[in-house]
């Protein structure tokens, strides 16, 4: 019996994720207030921050707090949005930006405590979008393209349409139930959504970045699927390459 309990405990720890800090209940992680931008790169990230309408599954939650403690996520059991309809402490969206092939890429990512329920359950899920603009230092910067990067190296490339922008020219995304695979996906929508407090990768305290970088967000019951934080150093540029929506380096 003791060995059975130890094995179950070890398996649970593997699924929940490991890091050098502390794992916390998903609804107790304290989000960061959105900092006041101090440069044009941060201003652009705030300017283009999308709205998110959730029609399926979990709402976004903070993944890490200031001391580096990270969300333990949720088991993929019960209703698809069970215990994850929004944190009373507030939500969060994360971003990281850089030049890529002569265009400025702003990657936004939302953390969901679970991705899907049932036999193929996912604990931890990241939904990611990349917005491409011409130059963040320009007051009249132009939106050039959008990629909905689904975390498993698949990319959706859809032309930007007016109905997918709000009155302030902010993009509107929907987190919906994907066909053939009951898990959250991002798509463009005409529905009004909500925005979350944004914090960029560079604005995060060092302990928080370390927590997100070292935690292994294992999602499957046997720890075989790892949901990596898309903004961390060894993943970010690979994701930009996956998300590149233009036919060559100089397409506008």
UniProtKB/Swiss-Prot annotation:
Its main location: secreted. Residues 1-17 form the signal peptide. Glycans are attached at residues 20, 67, 166. A motif (Hepta-peptide GHRHDWE motif) lies at residues 121-127. GO terms for cellular component: extracellular region. Keywords: Glycoprotein, Secreted, Signal, Virulence. Disulfide bonds: none annotated. InterPro entries: NPP1. Pfam families: NPP1. It is found in: Secreted. Secreted effector that contributes strongly to virulence during infection by P.capsici. Belongs to the Necrosis inducing protein (NPP1) family. Key residues/motif important for the effector activities are degenerated in most NLPs, including the nlp24 peptide consisting of the conserved region I (11-aa immunogenic part) and conserved region II (the heptapeptide GHRHDWE motif) that is important for phytotoxic activity. This is NLP effector protein Pc118356. It comes from Phytophthora capsici.
